[in-house]
């Protein structure tokens, strides 16, 4: 039997509140993270992802208190990211109740951090978050046409997103969270081309993120190679439930829990 596709609500947290915007801007309050986490657990979410969206750009540490309170209330795996810069940061988050930790900007600056975390805690703990966008006409391009960005998509790195995902997996990342900055918050669907290209280069689990707006957007992401599908605003604002997404995946022939 094939491995079940995971459905993962994402909680973008700013100053202890869940927020959602378009392309990480114009943030709108979406509620209390602990309450939302409990709701998604009850709805049958397979995991939760918690991202401190101010931690990297504002150079603030992730809010351990919110992680701790969330972990006390939910019993599904919790991935936490945002502002993770060191092995010590990972250890603090795991002690607070995280099951997996997302690393992004710090790994770009110092790729060996991936191996250090994987060696200390195991590859299964480490999720590499890749915020990628398509290069525009007239801009310097990458081999795949997808560039890794930082600071909520506001800063290009010149790194090819497909190459970076492949390299990170080789260095020890246990999972790739691939977030399309072009699609983020638009509700226009996942970037299927980018998913397909990354899937061709990595064997570790791949999480599709950015662009979910309708129940019909999820099965094509799985067909493009995603092992898990992540969404935020469609869940937070009640447009879709986790169960509806699982029904659509099941109808398309995917195994779900």
Curated annotation (Swiss-Prot):
Superkingdom of origin organism: Bacteria
Catalytic site: 12, 131
Pathway: Amino-acid biosynthesis; L-histidine biosynthesis; L-histidine from 5-phospho-alpha-D-ribose 1-diphosphate: step 5/9
Signal peptide positions on this chain: none
Keywords in alphabetical order: Amino-acid biosynthesis, Cytoplasm, Histidine biosynthesis, Lyase
Entry annotated with the keyword Cytoplasm: yes
Pfam families xref list: His_biosynth
Catalytic activity: 5-[(5-phospho-1-deoxy-D-ribulos-1-ylimino)methylamino]-1-(5-phospho-beta-D-ribosyl)imidazole-4-carboxamide + L-glutamine = D-erythro-1-(imidazol-4-yl)glycerol 3-phosphate + 5-amino-1-(5-phospho-beta-D-ribosyl)imidazole-4-carboxamide + L-glutamate + H(+)
Subcellular location: Cytoplasm
Any one GO cellular component localisation term in the record: cytoplasm
GO molecular-function terms, A-Z: imidazoleglycerol-phosphate synthase activity; lyase activity
Alphabetized NCBIfam families for the sequence: hisF
Family stated for the protein in its record: Belongs to the HisA/HisF family.
Function: IGPS catalyzes the conversion of PRFAR and glutamine to IGP, AICAR and glutamate. The HisF subunit catalyzes the cyclization activity that produces IGP and AICAR from PRFAR using the ammonia provided by the HisH subunit.
HAMAP family: HisF
Record protein name field: Imidazole glycerol phosphate synthase subunit HisF
Organism the protein comes from: Kineococcus radiotolerans (strain ATCC BAA-149 / DSM 14245 / SRS30216)
Organism lineage string: Bacteria, Bacillati, Actinomycetota, Actinomycetes, Kineosporiales
